[in-house]
């Protein structure tokens, strides 16, 4: 989701190059068509606006066209420097990064949860059918009792979550670390996103769902989002994408990109609030 530019575009290209069958979505349909035509491995695309109520339905259509889904990657987001606190900009940021984020991530999570429940039910039915056949065979089943018991244990293990783990990976930001006065709605929504992902990770364990969550926190990336700005330590989208794909494939839960920003975030967290608000007020 959000594959028409920036990090989302680079991650889609890299996943396709790594052998994944990729479905892409975003608001700009012409960009989606161009990407699909130019990138082997991108097998489906769909125009989706995360701020629209029908966006989850469109996501389900894309999943159906793909024939299933193992990974949902969310990179849709907007943000501005907004020292003047323009209300329209603030509300648009909340609409996309807040409402749109929850709308799509919860839709992906619920789809995975339903699939896991259906798969577990099917495995249980298959195990029950095998047990019935073994019982009907009488003495033969008795001789092969140990084998049947072993199969039952294997089925139970699979039902308890040993199947391939689904994964939801989302781009938040280092902006979630502290409130940034220059971008109030942006940093606030990024904080919300990080907490929401943490909640889903906890809920997946509570419900014994085999769904992994990856929270990706990049620093300033040279994309359209910050075009024309003079932010320091800007990262290349291609480099960030490579780190993201590695993190996904390794099952990382949280990754801050890159090492310089990990040091910066650690320093930010040590600053007390009374000092932080004074530091950021200095021009």
Segments predicted by a language model, with ranges:
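Conserved glycine-rich cofactor-binding loop
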Residues: 4-5
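Rossmann-fold cofactor-recognition segment
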Residues: 39-54
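Conserved NAD(P)H cofactor-binding loop of Rossmann-fold oxidoreductase domains
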Residues: 75-81
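Short alpha-helical oligomerization interface
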Residues: 82-95
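Active-site helix of classical SDR
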Residues: 105, 189
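Residue(s) in the substrate-gating loop at a strand-loop-helix junction
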Residues: 173
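C-terminal helical subdomain
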Residues: 215, 227-265
